[in-house]
Design a protein with these regions (language model features):
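Ribokinase/PfkB-type carbohydrate-kinase core domain
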Residues: 1-10, 60, 68, 72-86, ...
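Short secondary-structure boundary/capping elements
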Residues: 36-43, 88-91, 114-118
Length: 132
């Protein structure tokens, strides 16, 4: 039995910082660009594991570079991935995030493999979080 099982999304976040968000049809220059592991589910699983909880994650990724990155992050954090699925021919979820100088963000999510997540028949955990 795990302390925490998270059923949720795993995304590769593509983050650009810019002075201001563009208006429709407008192009603005970005100041910085970075990629981060993300997704509400993966973020919750990482937080639980870092807090010392034995943690499992139920989710889905593609068999692409982004999916391999997210799997590696979860493994490094000590998260059990026995119910984590690699989907062929379906891309890993992505989030395109713009952050302005005030820290306000705008997010577009492409669910990808997250749209294929299926809850297992049973979960053995003290706490279950659903973060899709």
């Amino acid at each position: 039995m795990f302390d925490v099982t998270v059923l949720g999304s795993a995304n590769l976040d593509l983050v650009v910082r810019t002075e201001r968000h563009p208006s429709p049809g407008e192009t603005v220059l970005g100041d910085d660009f970075a990629e981060y592991p993300g997704g509400k589910g993966l973020n919750q699983a990482v937080a639980a594991a870092r807090a010392g909880a034995s943690t499992s994650f139920v989710g889905a990724i593609g068999t692409d570079d982004a999916g391999r990155t997210l799997r590696s992050v979860a493994e490094i954090e000590g998260i059990d991935l026995s119910q984590f699925v690699d989907r062929d021919n379906v891309p890993t979820g992505r989030a395109l995030i713009t952050v302005d100088h005030r820290g306000e963000n705008s997010i577009v999510v492409v669910p990808g493999a997250n749209a294929t997540v299926v809850a297992p028949a049973s979960i053995s955990a003290l706490v279950v979080l659903c973060q899709l």
